[in-house]
A protein has these predicted regions:
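Class I SAM-dependent methyltransferase Rossmann-like catalytic core
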Residues: 1-17
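Conserved alpha-helix/loop element of class I SAM-dependent methyltransferases that forms part
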Residues: 14-31
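Class I SAM-dependent methyltransferase SAM/SAH-binding core
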Residues: 36, 41-95
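A conserved beta-strand element that flanks and buttresses the S-adenosyl-L-methionine
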Residues: 107
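A short His-aromatic
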Residues: 110-114
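A short glycine-rich, Lys/Arg-flanked "PGG" loop and its adjoining helix->strand segment in the class I
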Residues: 119-134
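Conserved catalytic/acceptor-binding region of the Class I
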Residues: 134-215
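Conserved Class I S-adenosyl-L-methionine
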Residues: 187-278
Length: 278
């Protein structure tokens, strides 16, 4: 399973569910008594669940440091309300430390795309949940870029395709999560799409400036070099892409200096809800 830092998770999930929670309607959060959020990471979805439900909410992750962050952030968010605090438990998604039928809703967000065997995890979810299982997973193959630097979208598309071919897990799983659910024995109730927009516009924060600098130096692309070279991309083709990538990064920095740079990345997520068969 791929691991991510708390800062990365917060940054990439910032703003999710702030605009609309309609895609979560079939989770029936208001009526849930006990919810388990598996692979909770830094707790972005966990906090939404706690806000929308009066029941018990538990965050579970294999990374203890992420759990400590989630515990602290959720306590700060709801301490002024009458809702109970969110509890956290360390555990592996494929071997959950929970009894059979111990929750009535089990959720995960951007977890299955990082697992080599998502079906095994969902089978474990079926064991632990007495009623519903919901997976909120992206289709990273359908990400779109709208940028004021014309070549940025094209170059990111080329880099993403190479990464998708080289990565060892199915990072496009969101669009086909229904198949995983059915294989694991769930009755699929619904699938709803939710588009998560990540926007950069003036005034630029420090993170946006850092990303631009990493484009110009090629450092951002280099982070994924090994994975990209597991695809059909040759070393020479990677070097050509990196050269174009760095030139694009310099154009981004120039546009930022004039306050002309704007970019929106849209990541489609799919909320798949299934019911445990009696």
């Amino acid at each position: 399973m791929r691991a991510f830092s708390e800062a990365y998770l917060r940054r990439t999930r910032a703003g999710m569910w702030a605009d609309s929670r309609d895609a979560l309607a079939d989770l029936e959060l208001a009526s849930r008594e006990r919810i388990l959020d598996v692979g909770c990471g830094s707790g972005e979805l966990t906090r939404v669940l706690a806000e929308e439900s009066s029941g018990t909410v538990i965050g579970c992750d294999v990374d203890r440091s992420l759990l400590e962050y989630t515990r602290g952030s959720t306590e700060n968010d709801i301490e002024a309300s009458s809702k109970p605090s969110v509890s956290v438990v360390q555990g592996d998604a494929t071997r959950l430390p929970f009894a059979t039928d111990s929750v009535d809703l089990l959720t995960c967000q951007a977890l299955l795309i990082n697992l080599p065997d998502p079906v095994t995890a969902v089978e474990e979810f079926v064991r632990v949940s007495s009623d519903l299982v919901a997976a909120i997973e992206p289709d990273n193959g359908a990400v779109t870029i709208d940028s004021t630097v014309p070549q940025e979208a094209t170059l990111e598309h080329r880099a993403r395709n190479a990464y998708l071919e080289g990565v060892e897990t199915d990072v496009t799983l969101g669009v086909s999560a229904r198949d995983v659910f059915e294989t694991a024995g769930l009755d699929v109730l619904s699938t709803h799409r939710y588009d998560h927009d990540r926007t950069i516009s003036p005034p630029y924060d420090e993170h946006a400036l850092t990303v631009a600098r990493r484009k110009a130096t090629g450092a951002g692309l280099a982070d994924d070099r090994a994975t990209m070279l597991q695809s059909d991309l040759t070393g020479a083709e990677y070097d050509d892409l990196r050269s174009e990538w760095r030139a694009m990064g310099r154009d981004v920095i120039e546009a930022m200096q004039d306050g002309r740079y704007e970019r929106t990345e849209t990541v489609p997520f799919y909320v798949t809800v299934g019911r445990v068969q009696p």
